[in-house]
């Protein structure tokens, strides 16, 4: 290409050239360049407007963000407060020499200053505190007996073997005060025998039954002792024995036990028609103390 053509091309491309004013073709190209520049400025302004809007929105968001952070902070604070309520009971105990005196220093999780409380050290709680995993609470001691020694807690302190007191107390309570066995006197035994007789007569409906040989021997020995005793007791026992014998005879005469092969249960005989008529006419059966054994029961 020649230098004239190059210069013409450059002048055509340049917007403020004198050839552009002279020639109409150059004026058309200038208008197109102006329109393109205007569209570029408009597009740049349009592009700048959203940027400004986005910047304003971002600024407003940045201004509104602290509010949300405040809310989150308040929520986190409330959660921490709830956690502190539960942490009140978990206190980290500081090791000090005041244990022997019965005092314990422990630091509350809410306050930094240590507080002093007077508490008596209980023997059932271990003196070893667990500081691992952030848990600071009392762990109850367990007894591990090895070679005559007892380890409290996690084996940090060793104590000599000692018997627990509650076992000794239970043994002393279970033992009776008097080491001699409980024995009944002969009088008490005879009273119990009479009560047993009365119960048997009530259950069977008759007082005519044979006693075993051991009880007969006891009755005979009791009669001999009563004869050697004072006269008043002897007379009272004789009257009691006489009334008992009379009542036994009358009961045997009134009610006799009937046994049969068909019926194995002992039942008294049925009453006569005369006795039944007397009972119905009187309305209520009359109990004679001398004839019936029920009037001679001994009160217990």
Curated annotation (Swiss-Prot):
Q: Looking at the record's lineage, which domain of life comes first?
A: Eukaryota
Keyword Secreted listed? The answer is no
Task: Decide whether keyword Phosphoprotein is in the record.
Answer: yes
Matching Pfam families: RSRP
Fetch the InterPro entries from UniProt. RSRP1
Residue stretches of biased makeup (Basic residues): 37-104, 126-141
Comp. bias (Low complexity): 23-36, 116-125
Q: Where is this region: Disordered?
A: 1-142, 222-300
Could you list this entry's UniProt keywords, alphabetically sorted.
Answer: Methylation, Nucleus, Phosphoprotein
Disulfide bridge map: none
UniProt PTM comment: Phosphorylated. Phosphorylation at Ser-120 and Ser-122 mediates the interaction with spliceosome proteins.
Q: Name one GO biological process term.
A: spliceosomal complex assembly
Q: Which family does it belong to?
A: Belongs to the RSRP family.
Q: What does this protein do?
A: Probably acts as a spliceosomal factor that contributes to spliceosome assembly and regulates the isoform switching of proteins such as PARP6.
The protein here is known as Arginine/serine-rich protein 1
What is the organism field in this record? Rattus norvegicus
């Amino acid at each position: 290409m020649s230098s004239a053509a190059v210069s013409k091309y450059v002048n055509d491309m340049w917007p403020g050239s004198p050839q552009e004013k002279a020639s109409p073709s150059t004026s058309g190209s200038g208008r197109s360049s102006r329109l393109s520049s205007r569209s570029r400025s408009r597009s740049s302004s349009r592009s700048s407007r959203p940027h400004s809007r986005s910047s304003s929105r971002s600024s407003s968001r940045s201004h509104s963000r602290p509010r949300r952070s405040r809310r989150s902070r308040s929520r986190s604070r409330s959660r921490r407060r709830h956690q502190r309520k539960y942490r009140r009971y978990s206190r980290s105990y500081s090791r000090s020499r005041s244990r022997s005196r019965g005092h314990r220093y422990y630091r509350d999780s809410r306050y930094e200053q240590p507080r002093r409380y007077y508490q008596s050290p209980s023997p059932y709680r271990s003196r070893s505190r667990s500081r691992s995993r952030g848990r600071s609470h009392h762990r109850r001691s367990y007894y591990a007996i090895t070679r005559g020694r007892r380890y409290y807690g996690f084996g940090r302190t060793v104590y000599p073997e000692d018997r627990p007191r509650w076992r000794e107390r239970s043994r002393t309570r279970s033992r009776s005060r008097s080491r001699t066995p409980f024995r009944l006197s002969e009088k008490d035994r005879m009273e119990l025998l009479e009560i047993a007789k009365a119960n048997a007569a009530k259950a069977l409906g008759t007082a005519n039954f044979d006693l075993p040989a051991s009880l007969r021997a006891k009755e005979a020995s009791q009669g001999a002792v009563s004869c050697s005793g004072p006269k008043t007791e002897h007379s009272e026992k004789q009257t009691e024995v006489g009334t008992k014998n009379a009542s036994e005879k009358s009961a045997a005469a009134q009610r006799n036990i009937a046994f049969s092969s068909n019926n194995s249960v002992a039942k008294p005989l049925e009453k006569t028609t005369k006795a039944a008529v007397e009972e119905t006419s009187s309305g209520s059966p009359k109990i004679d103390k001398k004839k019936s054994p029920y009037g001679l029961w001994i009160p217990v």
